Amino acid sequence: MQVSVETTEGLGRRLTISVPAEQIEKMVKDGITREAKRARLPGFRPGKVPLSEINKRYGQAIRQDVMGEVMQRNFIEAIIAEKLNPAGAPTFMPGKSVGESFEFVATFEIYPEITLTGLDTIAVEQPKAEVNDADLDAMIETLRKQHATFAVVERASAAGDKVKMNFVGSIDGEEFDGGKADDFELEIGSNRMIPGFETGVTGHKAGETFDIEVSFPEDYHAENLKGKAAKFAITLTEVQAAQLPEVNDEFATLFGITSGGVDALKAEIRKNMTRELEQALKANVKEQVINGLLAANDVTIPSALIDGEVEVLRKQAMQRFGGQTKNMPELPAELFTEQAERRVKIGLLLGEVIKTSELKAEDSRVQALIASMASAYEDPAEVVAYYNSNKEMMQNMRNVALEEQAVEALLKSAKVTTKEVAFEEFMNKASGRA
């Protein structure tokens, strides 16, 4: 076998491989002989079919199989000999005879050679937060509101109330499509309506008729309403006030607390809040580290890896539609390209961190990750057992553990400062509510 390597563009490589023709002819002959031994043809005894008959019937197919095997086998031998690391499957060009050799071409991309740089320039502001009594009280108040009942009241509406109304909207004196409703229910403070609408409804009693003037936002979804000033004629028909449940043992049972009452409920809520806070703090630091790593290391990435990641993201997006994708057009790759590129770069760079730091997934860390995740379920022991019995899920958790270890390794050389933050402020920002 003779091999020549060319660089086409960037990470692209072209291998030209020559194989002695006699080697191929021998493989074809051996293939015909094997087929003759197992062939069952009318007019011939089993195993006695002439080789010429086998060649006439199956020779072309056997030769094609041999060519495919020759290309695959010699390609693998060639990349090992040339120390090439392909990213994705190769494309084989049709082979041709050159003198006494069979020559074929394989084109592919290789993984980039990565040398990590600028690790000491990564800047991380590590947030520090804890769950205090005020945070716990605020969470309990939120849970009370979530389990509130509503009762009709004879007073002016206020924030937190539910109101029922009839309204007609108009622009320049003309009604517009979608601007009219009867028995429309709205919770004041939900921010469901355009700016100014809920404020205009606040302070009115059932039975009152009044007008409010508002403007549709410039980014409103309906093109014909963007930025337009509108008037709504409103008749308020009902005001309901929230009735919050008392925090007692009965309230605790709503959350699966069967013993220990309010104290047990508070302990469980604090535990859950602390777990979520720790996860959010860890995710925040990880994002900063990865952003710094990307900024310090520009990596050329193989298009084959991007294409593969695009397909993964596309399938995930389709699955979020609940599998109802039969009649849906395929989502364009452009929707996922930027995210795919980022994910591939992160994978390559973290992979290099793991390799250069000689990291291996620590069993204790893997089990701690599983236990932490399982604690959010009703039967944690069952979840832990399920993970430990599933090879694929265990491998996923090992990958998560390795990522954590890689981030910790990067933190050792990063410029780290700390900042005290309030629980509510930090969690709102982490969830995108700030």
From Swiss-Prot:
> Sorted alphabetically, which Gene3D superfamilies does this protein's record hold?
3.10.50.40, Trigger factor ribosome-binding domain, Trigger factor, C-terminal domain
Picking any one GO biological process from the record gives: protein transport
The superkingdom listed in its UniProt entry is Bacteria
Where, per UniProt, does this protein localize? Cytoplasm
What EC designation does it have?
5.2.1.8
PROSITE patterns, per database record? FKBP_PPIASE (PS50059)
Looking at the Swiss-Prot or TrEMBL record, what is one Pfam family this protein matches?
Trigger_N
Reaction equations catalysed = [protein]-peptidylproline (omega=180) = [protein]-peptidylproline (omega=0)
Could you tell me which residue ranges the PPIase FKBP-type domain spans?
160-245
The Swiss-Prot or TrEMBL record annotates one GO molecular function as: peptidyl-prolyl cis-trans isomerase activity
* Gene Ontology CC, one term: cytoplasm
Q: What is known of its domains?
A: Consists of 3 domains; the N-terminus binds the ribosome, the middle domain has PPIase activity, while the C-terminus has intrinsic chaperone activity on its own.
Function field: Involved in protein export. Acts as a chaperone by maintaining the newly synthesized protein in an open conformation. Functions as a peptidyl-prolyl cis-trans isomerase.
Q: Which family does it belong to?
A: Belongs to the FKBP-type PPIase family. Tig subfamily.
**Name of the protein this chain belongs to:** Trigger factor
Q: Which organism is it from?
A: Shewanella denitrificans (strain OS217 / ATCC BAA-1090 / DSM 15013)
